[in-house]
Design a protein with these regions (language model features):
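N-terminal Rossmann-like NAD(P) cofactor-binding module of classical short-chain dehydrogenase/reductase
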Residues: 86-88
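Catalytic nucleophile loop
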Residues: 32, 96, 230
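Beta-strand-loop-alpha-helix segment that lines the small-molecule cofactor/substrate pocket
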Residues: 92, 97-145, 159
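Short glycine/serine/threonine-enriched helix-capping/active-site loop
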Residues: 138-141, 166-170
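Conserved SAM-binding strand-loop segment of SAM-dependent methyltransferases
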Residues: 69-74
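Contiguous beta-strand/loop segments that form the cofactor/metal-binding neighborhood of enzyme cores
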Residues: 150-151, 163, 168, 175-213, ...
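N-terminal Rossmann-like dinucleotide-binding module
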Residues: 2-65, 143-146, 234
Length: 386
């Protein structure tokens, strides 16, 4: 691994405190384009290169956010540029680890969308490679930088909730209608084989390209998409990062032609807390969030804010007090704070709020839930199995 560190060092551009960072973007679909818009709002950087296997995506990103940027089909061509300090990765999940490894070996710092891994076994070697390279890697669990989440954690650390034994997480999206179709894809402008990467070859399939997250070769469904956000918060707040047991079930009630379930539930047991997750593509009532239950109080937490409710002194049929004893509202999307934290750490070389170790632990929980889901409904660590 020493060669990796040496190679990375030879690529580094020496940055001064006031230098504008030079950024490249890989996988410039909808999410990455949003991240590019935030980079422009922050303004301490220049987007100098964009890369995507689909020409309309990269040209759209260039036109909207970086008219003077060079555009590339192959990430290798972008990464070999010695004038690029950092890359933002928004490619499908199965490309995350290969791209992170290539980037840090080329001396680039990395902001990568979650889940940081596509397979659970990718985690340890990824951590080792990033640590050896000395590069900054921020993973896209933006709650780690979102002010009201950080304030909520401070309350929990201060004992406001007492001993927490149960966390319910949920994410309901009214996305069923959006999943039925998508814009046409001009296959003459798509490098399909490049999109497949390490996945087995198959002829072009519109749904697998447009909705790749719902196919096992490219993503992990809601467990490694939505659940990863919330389980990361649960692990962060409770100090747990390794489940000891998991159960899960789910089905394809809405989209039977896909591979991953559209309706599911999971429960992960940790040494000091039980974390549950349920999700479906219907009914946006409640949206997504978490409920922490402790011996002194309960906390409802989501992207719009949080509220704390004192525990009742005796049993009551009143399931929720009318008035929260503590409440906070969020004023903006914390992704911009997460990106700003990344850019500041590129300059300072401090550890970011969601380093690779955090990203691997969050993704691991999603993988464990999928093991239970795809197996007999139960997962235990190998050493615990009979």
């Amino acid at each position: 691994m020493g060669a990796v560190a040496t190679a990375a060092a030879s690529y580094n551009r020496i940055l001064g405190a006031n230098d504008r960072l030079r950024i490249g973007a890989i996988g410039t679909g909808q999410r990455c384009q949003y991240l590019l818009s935030l980079l422009n709002k922050i303004g301490s950087n220049d987007i100098v290169a964009v890369c995507d296997v689909y020409e309309p995506h990269r040209l759209e990103a260039k036109a909207k956010f970086a008219p003077d940027a060079n555009d590339y089909v192959h990430s290798e061509d972008l990464l070999e540029r010695k004038d690029i300090d950092a890359v933002v990765i928004g490619a499908p999940d199965h490309w995350h680890v290969p791209l992170i490894l290539a980037a840090v070996r080329a001396g680039k710092d990395v902001y990568c969308e979650k889940p940081v891994t596509h397979r659970i076994e990718e985690g340890p070697p990824l951590i080792a490679a990033v640590q050896e390279s000395k590069r900054i890697v921020q993973t896209g669990t933006q709650q780690r930088s979102w002010e009201h989440y950080r304030n909520a954690k401070a309350l929990i650390d201060g004992g406001v909730l007492g001993k927490i034994t149960f966390v319910r997480t949920y994410w309901y999206q009214n996305h069923f209608a959006n999943q039925q179709s998508g814009p046409p894809i001009d296959t003459s402008k798509l490098d399909w084989r490049r999109f497949l990467g390490t996945a087995p070859y198959r002829p072009f399939n519109h749904d697998q390209y447009a909705h790749w997250r719902w196919y096992w070769d490219f993503g992990g469904g809601a467990m490694t998409d939505l659940f990863v956000h919330w389980v990361d918060v649960a692990q962060w707040f409770t100090g747990n990062d390794m489940p000891t047991r998991a159960t899960a079930c789910g089905s394809k009630f809405l989209l039977p032609e896909r591979q991953t379930p559209d309706t599911m539930s999971a429960a992960l047991l940790y040494p000091s807390v039980l974390v549950e997750f349920d999700s479906t593509l219907l009914g946006y009532i409640e949206g997504g969030g978490l409920m922490f239950r402790g011996t002194k109080a309960a906390m409802r937490l989501h992207r719009r804010g949080f509220a704390v409710y004192d525990e009742l002194p005796a049993y009551s049929e009143s399931y929720e007090p009318d008035v929260a004893v503590l409440e906070a509202k969020s004023t903006h999307d914390g992704t911009i704070d997460h990106m700003r934290n990344f850019l500041e750490c590129v300059q300072s070389r401090n550890t970011p709020n969601a380093p690779v170790e955090v990203g691997v632990a969050a993704a691991r929980a999603g993988h464990v839930a999928n093991f239970a889901l795809r197996g007999n409904g139960v997962w235990m660590p190998p050493q615990q199995k009979a």
